[in-house]
């Protein structure tokens, strides 16, 4: 295997690890990065790679939040943690809208909306939305300050925002769910954590869907590229999640909004020129 392909896989994993958790759109970045860094693989495998490396990102959430995610305790005997079970029920509810639309219409959505025009528009529009929401919420105290306070109705509403991200690339799954949560009155830290947890079934399901669609017939070289990309995404995701949680305890999301606007304009200008 050429060393250059390994370096490409590492770099793509780094991009995935950063952009999957920060509300800045992994798709928007991957479209730009793909213009300059192309894996020397088949188109089918490239599509699988770009989705399956998300498994590395998922594992980072499981590692960092294991005690909050595991629904049972072994301390002093086996018993279910009701608050965690309730949280998982809400997460499943939030996943329903995207699942209903995403699975049967995955190919049609990609064909219609996976282009630079859609990505640039959603980057800019949700960037503006972030700034507007933070300006609106300035000085206000959030109504929901813990995940246990999220109701089933709130879970459905957050799920609808996740559906928007599933349909329109560039929205950013984390960006859409955080925007939805902030609009409802969820605190920044709770919105971010709920978004992290919500990613586990969503991204795991998306990875399985791609694997089943394109099959599991990989060469040893392709398996190595997948593993390296996942490992890179895993390590960088841990750092990105820790950074975001520290950052939003002292700052709002407006900086990410401005970044999205700049990136959206850059994507639009680049592809119009090229």
UniProtKB/Swiss-Prot annotation:
Q: Where are the transmembrane segments?
A: 47-67, 85-105, 113-133, 150-170, 196-216, 225-245, 253-273
Name under which the protein is recorded:
Undecaprenyl-diphosphatase 1
Listed GO MF terms = undecaprenyl-diphosphatase activity
Bilayer topology term = Multi-pass membrane protein
The protein's annotated catalytic reaction(s) are: di-trans,octa-cis-undecaprenyl diphosphate + H2O = di-trans,octa-cis-undecaprenyl phosphate + phosphate + H(+)
Which NCBIfam families does the record cross-reference, listed alphabetically?
A: PRK00281.1-4 (NF001390), PRK00281.1-5 (NF001391), undec_PP_bacA (TIGR00753)
State which Enzyme Commission number(s) the record gives.
3.6.1.27
What sections of the sequence does the record tag as coiled-coil?
Answer: none
Subcellular localization(s) per the UniProt record: Cell membrane
What HAMAP family does this protein map onto? Undec_diphosphatase
* A single BP term in Gene Ontology: response to antibiotic
Species assigned in the record: Clostridium acetobutylicum (strain ATCC 824 / DSM 792 / JCM 1419 / IAM 19013 / LMG 5710 / NBRC 13948 / NRRL B-527 / VKM B-1787 / 2291 / W)
Q: Which gene encodes it?
A: uppP1
